Amino acid sequence: MRTSTPSSTMTKSGSAPPALRARSLSKSYRSPVLDNLDLDIEQGQFVAIMGPSGSGKSTLLHCLSGMDRPSGGSVLLGDTEITSLSEKELAALRLTHFGFVFQQAHLMPTLCLLDNIVLPGYLAGLRPRPEITARGRRLMERMGISEQAASGVTEVSGGQLQRAGICRALINDPGIVFADEPTGALNSATALQILDLLGQVHASGTTLVMVTHDARVAARADRVLVLVDGCIAEDLALGEYEEARAAQRLSAVSEALQRRSV
């Protein structure tokens, strides 16, 4: 059973509130990276984040997911303002409510694939260990890597490592999965397979927030945010577009915005 959102409530109409809300979200390092963003992400939505290099894509994902703290503003998960949580509370929330898929899986080299996958489940302590292990095996079967359960990290391909990374992200049945360029280090054929698997994750009801530079990847999303200079320059709903037409539209928008930002 999916872990419930902290302090989540239903609206008066009976519909669920947004999965994530950002209000006046800002982030600065030596200079501003995110500039006073407001954003609602609905439950079950697949949101892709695009934009030129340095536009704030990964920073936005990190602030939304609690991996980095904003310089100003707030992020709410249900009714819980995660930006006000302590580091310990935030770490527990990330472990139990969020899943993460990165460009590189970053698995522990001393553990086999199955042990890497179930470790976050053991740490969360939400279920008995035998149940967590059984879930890990089911996820590996679902991702097509069940035969590699006992294999070491150096004994499998990059695509198999990324599949294991997806399994690890799902071990605690998170409500939201954050993905940062999950296909960026893969060849075209393997990248398509990984996208199909992430599409299945989204189809099961999981909210998916993905950073990508590739219009063909973003074209699979329900909604695409295009960032320029830390601001949302475009917020596109793609539901009415076929995937090929969506990719063409996104490519045109992205190219125009990149020219504008130069």
Language-model-derived ranges and their functions:
Residues 50-52:
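The feature captures the beta-strand-to-loop junction immediately N-terminal to the Walker
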Residues 95, 151-154, 172, 204:
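Conserved signature/switch motifs of ABC ATPase nucleotide-binding domains
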Residues 177-180:
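Catalytic Walker B motif of ABC-type/P-loop ATPase nucleotide-binding domains
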